[in-house]
């Protein structure tokens, strides 16, 4: 019989893993795990060990694991027609129906959907659209895109440049020249630096910094601004009060397109269909992935607004067929999975559950950790939450990075059979469980997290990193 160790040893020899210390993993000095199944909010490894997946894979398994309806939809579509390209006007029934459903959910002002396979490639498409749009309008110099520090938009050359996290730039010669990064809407630390600044004042400050950057670069060179409604991988940071209204006003003033990256927030995660709806954002372009299929198949998309679509049509009238395409765009199996997934979200009221049970998640996290000696902030929205750890919560001071407090918290949670993610920048533990999560499951997530956090806190106290209470 093939053991778990056998599989991991084989894996070490042949697989290039993302976000992994490649040498340590290949030489057996970093752990591996083979996942064999899942049901609801739990996954199981080859040894039969069961974990609560408090992060829904990577914020993506919105409907939970083991949904036979989606598997059946993929199977039936594979029997009927597994693949044909969608170039030069070719289509398939699932693509048409899924596009109609996405546009219905997105609401007025959105015109068409273009498909890819990942959020990264969707944002590559966004940048090509932005360039093409301005070339058609006779503005070839208007090509710069402003993103935000701590934003996450992918890990390609262009999409990785949009990402505002150091680990995705270092040693890759990123960002590319046309990408800029403005201040993150991260009120928690800014308020500590400038005591007395309200959330509304901080939002105005962020908008002023954006306007300052646009003016410094030259408004005739800045094409677009991209942002997640809620910062995801940058720390699960909901925007401060009034932030998006202030930002949108600046973009309108300088004729800068707004790209809403809904890869994490879309399809119910915030308790609304889209994070844009939750915060009153009016984007020109929207990026989608993850919750679109709940990761039962790879699928991403770009939703193109009316304003942009009119120019794209105009461009092909002048230049001929648009020079962009992916082999797997509009893949029939992915679109079939998307349709089945969105039907489950709608039928079972999972967006409403993300709002209601998500509110309970926020309440329970705050009750458990608001006064904890190493927790500086408890934050979140909908079915997303984060704990930010601090050596001195009153002063909001960071731990020494060498202590690796975030990774230690994540490892301690894993010992409690709970998956919670150590975010890549700062000592932050993130949660984004499936939208199917119940109140009872929230209670279990919080209980396991308490045990993990207390275990690491005790260790830090013994090490002299913090003072005993």
Swiss-Prot record:
Its main location: cytoplasm. The modification N6-(pyridoxal phosphate)lysine is found at residue 290. Keywords: Aminotransferase, Cytoplasm, Pyridoxal phosphate, Transferase. One of its GO terms (cellular component) is cytosol. Pfam families: Aminotran_3 (PF00202). Its EC number is 2.6.1.76. This reversible reaction is part of both, ectoine biosynthesis and ectoine degradation. Involved in the degradation of ectoine, which allows H.elongata to utilize ectoine as both a carbon and a nitrogen source for growth. This is Diaminobutyrate--2-oxoglutarate transaminase. It comes from Halomonas elongata (strain ATCC 33173 / DSM 2581 / NBRC 15536 / NCIMB 2198 / 1H9). The lineage of its organism: Bacteria, Pseudomonadati, Pseudomonadota, Gammaproteobacteria, Oceanospirillales. The gene is doeD.
């Amino acid at each position: 019989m093939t053991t778990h160790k056998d599989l991991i040893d084989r894996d070490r020899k042949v697989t290039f893993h993302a976000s992994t210390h490649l040498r340590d993993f290949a030489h057996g000095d970093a752990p591996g795990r083979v996942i064999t199944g899942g049901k609801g909010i739990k996954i199981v490894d080859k040894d039969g060990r069961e974990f609560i997946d408090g992060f829904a894979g990577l914020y993506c398994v919105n409907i939970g694991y083991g949904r036979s309806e989606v598997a059946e939809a993929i199977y039936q579509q594979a029997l009927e027609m597994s693949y044909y390209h969608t170039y030069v006007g070719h289509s398939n029934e699932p693509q048409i129906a899924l596009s109609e459903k996405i546009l219905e959910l997105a609401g007025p002002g959105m015109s068409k959907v273009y498909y890819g396979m990942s959020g990264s490639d969707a944002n590559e498409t966004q940048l090509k659209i932005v360039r093409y749009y301005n070339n058609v309008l006779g503005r070839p110099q208007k090509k710069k895109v402003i993103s935000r520090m701590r934003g996450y938009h992918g890990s390609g050359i262009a999409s990785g440049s949009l990402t505002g996290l150091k680990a995705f730039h270092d040693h890759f010669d990123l960002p590319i020249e046309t990408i800029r990064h403005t201040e993150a809407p991260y009120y928690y630390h800014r308020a500590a630096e400038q005591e007395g600044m309200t959330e509304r004042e901080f939002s105005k400050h962020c908008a002023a910094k954006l306007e300052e950057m646009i003016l410094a670069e030259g408004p005739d060179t800045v094409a677009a601004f991209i942002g997640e409604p809620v910062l995801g991988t940058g720390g699960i940071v909901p925007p401060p009060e009034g932030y998006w209204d202030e930002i949108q006003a600046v973009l309108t003033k300088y004729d800068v397109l707004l790209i809403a990256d809904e890869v994490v927030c879309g399809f119910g995660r915030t308790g609304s269909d889209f994070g844009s709806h939750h915060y009153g954002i009016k984007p020109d372009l929207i990026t989608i992935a993850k919750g679109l299929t709940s990761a039962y198949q790879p699928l991403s998309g770009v939703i193109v607004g009316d304003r942009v679509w009119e120019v794209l049509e105009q461009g092909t009238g002048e230049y001929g067929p648009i020079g962009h395409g992916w082999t797997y765009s509009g893949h029939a199996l992915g679109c079939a999975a998307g349709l089945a997934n969105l039907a489950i979200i709608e039928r079972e009221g999972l967006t409403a559950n993300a709002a209601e049970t998500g509110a309970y998640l926020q309440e329970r996290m705050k009750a458990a950790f608001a006064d904890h000696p190493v927790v500086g902030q408890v934050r979140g929205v909908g079915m997303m939450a984060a704990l930010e750890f601090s050596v001195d919560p009153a002063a909001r001071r960071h731990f020494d990075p060498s202590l690796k407090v975030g990774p230690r918290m994540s490892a301690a949670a894993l010992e409690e059979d709970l998956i919670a993610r150590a975010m890549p920048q700062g000592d932050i533990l993130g949660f984004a469980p499936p939208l199917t999560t119940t109140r009872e499951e929230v209670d279990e997530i919080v209980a396991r997290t308490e045990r993990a956090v207390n275990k690491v806190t005790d260790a830090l106290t013994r090490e002299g990193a913090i003072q005993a209470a």
